[in-house]
């Protein structure tokens, strides 16, 4: 800093009138060119925009220079220095009565941008894999001549906005007194605000291209207010992970060839009132006790409407604050990992809600959504559809997937509503959609996005799983991207689910006429890598529950449910079961109340179903025949697929280790007391599972723990055994 001997002049105090007009209107693209310190020959002019201040003083070293109020909160002073390195602003605000409240701060408009050219270039090309590190709100400390300056830097993408200002508790949510600057042609607006509270609330006041002025939550917010409040919150993780063993093991395995038995959970209603940290104890203990390998959480990203179950996301980078902080959510994931449980979260890149404070028409234009409503709106759900062809939007979503996998150690993403992304005419009337460049109905931009997302996450986070909820016959959903597929690890088998639930809902006396519904799935079982889903979608909106779908009285319902679950666990594919169904909840699920845990208060049919699921998981995990060849035809062989007269199905499962299981299920309401089953060889076959056993509150009918196979050929097999098949039951056997 150099003191000048030149005569000071007020000639440069007042900026150009157009600058003042745009500044006051909140529509200045570069407020830093007006505010802050600006050097002229022999002196420096410092300007500050503090509309609520009664006095502003520039403090330089030990000198105080009172600033002149020009107009409407714009203050300026000329000081006799050049090469000015540092200064502070002393701002007087009116207090109670005649009191004055003085606030001293570094000047926000003297700091250089916090984003580099490379970051902006990568973002513009849609290739910044750690986008959350440059956009959003970040605590920072800068070293200055007058000491360290701590605050928060803010950056938001709004390329068509006329102006963007930071608002929050720090300025009483008002005005345009914290205008941000746009960085070149990037469309990114940026500002570092000294002294911003480390957990402060904020929004962006966006002056849109359409003349609108809206207060917006940060699209990259890492934390939010608790809904229904909508502000974003500054946060910074201090969490120390303790799941190193899990993460190392994860990176070395391919989940397609590992056991996967998943409990799908809606965290807010599993046991209402629990926080993330309380769930870390109670949910973890329960899942371990029941023997599941994974938990799949309905969307945890922040959403304003609880009735959406999390599927209408407004803050893609923030775990819902209803249950705690982001670090509390990390604690939950960590606890599950330390207990040996994988964590999958539902992820919703297909669409987003139209709330005026969120992503929709963010800068007064269709920014995140497609500009053509025939592609940019999802009519069924009243939501916007992302513009998958826009590089910055694609980057926002791909980086978001990486964010959950890397910052929260999530093990997998279940991608919601993939079919709605793949087809331009999805749920649209004739004339209500536009074809692709080749005249087809395929959304080629969405295909490219899904391929890029899958290729990127599997490269960056080896061992994770991506699962598609895709309800059509789109080819190659789980085929690698280098072979033209979408690149998902697995896909929900919606056909199996629909056929199976239709079949088991029928009275046993009619099932023989629909036998094909239970065999059809094996015709395509190896066309994709499948998950067998009995999800939340099957226990809402009047569909009832698995229990209520079963025909008959309570005894028959319990037996039917037990046999269904055993059939699911024995069928090729990974398992997914929505919470409550593992103990036969009778009431349909609602997000507004908890599960009916009272059904387990005494020995009951529910206790029996729960005991069965625990044993299914234990047997499943310990028998490679049930999972190691899920994607290979060599892992399965029918014994008899055609015994419709008896409502019986039987098959063999084979493991990579040479193990095998013989599985036979009786869907009839009556016992088959002398049923002969073909087997690969003679000898003793141990009864590994009988869903009608006493421990499951069944009737106790069985084969005393084993059957003896003789060399009498049957079902095209060289040996066979005669056994008892209880009504509505499934039996598993293995060589003794």
UniProtKB/Swiss-Prot annotation:
It catalyses: Transfers a segment of a (1->4)-alpha-D-glucan chain to a primary hydroxy group in a similar glucan chain. Pathway: Glycan biosynthesis; glycogen biosynthesis. The keyword Mitochondrion does not apply. InterPro entries: A-amylase/branching_C (IPR006048), Branching_enzy (IPR037439), GlgB (IPR006407), GlgB_N (IPR054169), GlgB_N_E_set_prok (IPR044143), Glyco_hydro_13_cat_dom (IPR006047), Glyco_hydro_13_N (IPR004193), Glyco_hydro_b (IPR013780). GO terms for molecular function: 1,4-alpha-glucan branching enzyme activity; cation binding; hydrolase activity, hydrolyzing O-glycosyl compounds. GO terms for cellular component: cytosol. Disruption phenotype: Cells lacking this gene display maltose 1-phosphate (M1P) accumulation and trehalose sensitivity. These phenotypes are suppressed in mutants lacking both glgE and treS or both glgE and mak. The keyword Glycosyltransferase applies. It is an enzyme of class 2 (transferase). Signal peptide: none annotated. Pfam families: Alpha-amylase (PF00128), Alpha-amylase_C (PF02806), CBM_48 (PF02922), GlgB_N (PF22019). The active site is at 416 (nucleophile), 469 (proton donor). SMART domains: Aamy. GO terms for biological process: glycogen biosynthetic process. Belongs to the glycosyl hydrolase 13 family. GlgB subfamily. Catalyzes the formation of the alpha-1,6-glucosidic linkages in glycogen by scission of a 1,4-alpha-linked oligosaccharide from growing alpha-1,4-glucan chains and the subsequent attachment of the oligosaccharide to the alpha-1,6 position. Monomer. NCBIfam families: branching_enzym, PRK05402.1, PRK12313.1. This is 1,4-alpha-glucan branching enzyme GlgB.
